[in-house]
Amino acid sequence: MKQWFIDQSTKHPKRSIIVSILLTMLMGSGIQYFVIEDDFMKMLPQDIESMVTWNELKDEFGSTDLMFLGFGIRGEDALNSKTLAVLWDLSRALEGVAQVDEIICLSTSDKMESDDGFLEVSALQEYRDLDEADIAILRAYLDGNPKIKTRTLGSNGDYLNVMVRPLVGAKNDVLVRDLEQVVETYLSDYDVHWGGQAYLTGALPLLIRTDVMMLMRAGLIGMLLILLFSFRNIPSVGMVLATIVLSMVFMFGFNGWMYHLTGSDAFLFGMLNTSMPIILLTIANSYGVHVITKFFRKMRSNKDTRLAVEASISSLLLPIFLAALTTIAAFLCMVFAPLESLLGYGISISAGIAWAWLLSTIFLPSILVLKKWDPDSSAVSHASHFERFVLVFGDHVIKRPKTVLITGAVVVIIGAVGIFSLNIEVNMKSFFKPTNPIRQSLDFMDTEMTGSMDLQLLINADLRSPEVLNQIVSIQNFMESHKSVTLSISIADVIKQMHRMVNEDDPLFETIPDSREKINNLFTLYSMSGDPEDFSSLVDYDYKKGLATSMMRSISTSDVVILVDEIESFLQKDEFKDLNITITGMLIVFRDLVALIIRSSFISIFASILIIALIAGYFFKHWIWGILAIVPLTAAVILNFGLMGIFGVDLNHVTALLSAIIIGVGVDFALHYINQFRTLLRRHGLEGDISRETMQDVGFPVILDAASNMAFGALLFSEFIPMVHMGGLMVFAMVSTSMATLTLLAVLLELSKKYLARIEGITVA
């Protein structure tokens, strides 16, 4: 099999290149079916308990996840004829947007008034154009009904609040785009702020992908410049780039074909897939760097291109194959992930890795064979400054193995301690820097409006019972006592307002009536001039199931957990034992989702490490080699997650995927080092300096690979904090995986070489 691969590039290079390109184009034709999905909700698992409850709630009450729009002019009273006329036009235009179910604001809300003991229900803003007298009446009504005022008007009175209720199943990304187009038309003269989890899930994926793709291009350019500095040869850099590009085309085409053939949403390219091209790029670059550096070393000794290529592939075929196989196995462990999109992620990137392996062992060597190389050129005949530095570094490591081992162990232990300080955070507000316009809008909504989050309580009880309704009032009062909750709304508030109005608008009667009959009478009075369907978002037709919604300021994930625990503890009181209440909403889904992602990520990491150890042990013919292969990988994983805890880098559904990069690159370094060490051990026994020779042969490509991939530290300049963290962690991942290989693994092999020689059947004196 090894000879077949060698023959493809040394005997049939042109055919190999043409076939590789044609097969890439064939698979790449699937790009026509490649679908980018910016609807964040598509990635949510439908079978977790909180999601099932939330879906049931939406089926009964419609969408509960609102978008918030605040607009006005700072310091100018929003209750003026011009602004109210704009609100009138805007609300009707927004109602005409395809995926909007309801617009809640001053111009769409109703008011209740007393009329000789009867309820008179009419529009809160009756006309588009209001005069000063009309505005005075409106202002007085809002002052007398603080909950309505809080819901529709900013705390300083200079901004109006508009709530958008999407249709169930609406695509938030499309809806956000359509809403922003309408707002741009009507509110060009006003300061505009958006908020709400629904808005963020619609706006964020496209923003992140656009930002990352731009920075990825910068990272790619940086990577190529580092390679050029090290190789000192433009064609060799172009060869690595060609391998990367063809691998990318193959992966995206494969993804498109899989979606076309299966129709599965797992193969939609969403926000979580944004890291796929970065990971494949680093892996394809790694394979290419090893081939080019090995080729240059062989050219220095034999001066013959074909012989150099043959020797390079003969030496690298097994380690690159094992690196690809173990990395693919690691990514296929994503089948344990709770998200369908991660299943497609793992399968698609595995296809890209497999193709990168074939290209690096057939396509790339074929180009090397056809290129006319000058054996006396500096790129071929002389080691670069970078390469000489690595040799000096390696000598220091090998001369002080115990010191290096102890130092490395201490660093890893410190990292392990840091893991216990990891903070899980998925509040999307924390994704933005304080200077970002979206972050500033969210801050505005939190400080001056009703907030940018909401939480729902699904109540199963007799909602015409005075006792039950008073219990709901108590629960709402408890909710509103929390500093993050700005407003709580339920059917109990409507009943209290009706009770007040039929009693001559006396605030003393803003209470729950003391009998079921009185409550039934209130609904009867309302139906005479109002529509009972007005309550459909608060209570079901039979008044057996209701919804209490709390508007909230943005809080962290840990604070969400604390708040939910406090609510659950409060509901355990005896007075609420007859109520069946479920806490639900997108906040709860996100809380559970992140817990699932984090748990599945760690399961995937452990499964990957185990599989890598088994595969390496099998191919190297002893389990001890498998254990040694995962030493750098395990150390790097511990260090990265530990330092995240130490430096306060949040763990979320973006940074949790960092482990995939560590595994993809870390295992490659270790397998190359072990393969070369084992080859020299079998060839020379314990004679000579095996560790130094291994370091000379493998150290430079490992460091060059890591250094070139560090160019993706360009993500540090992202507008999004998780991407900034990922950029920094990626740089550190390159450092940790390469250093762990060239220090911990190197000294372990050096210290145990006699034992390893016995394993290989070599006589040890």
Where are these regions (language model features)?
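Hydrophobic, glycine/alanine-rich multi-pass transmembrane helices and their short helix-loop junctions
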Residues: I226, F321-F363, A613-A616, L639-D650, ...
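Helix-loop junctions and hydrophobic alpha-helical segments within the transmembrane domains
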Residues: K298-L325, R682-L704
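Signature of alpha-helical transmembrane segments and their immediate interfacial
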Residues: M1-D38, P365-S366, L370, A379-M428, ...
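Extracytoplasmic
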Residues: N55, D59, R128-N233, V473, ...
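Hydrophobic transmembrane alpha-helices and their membrane-interface caps
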Residues: S236-H290, W625-Y673, A714, I759
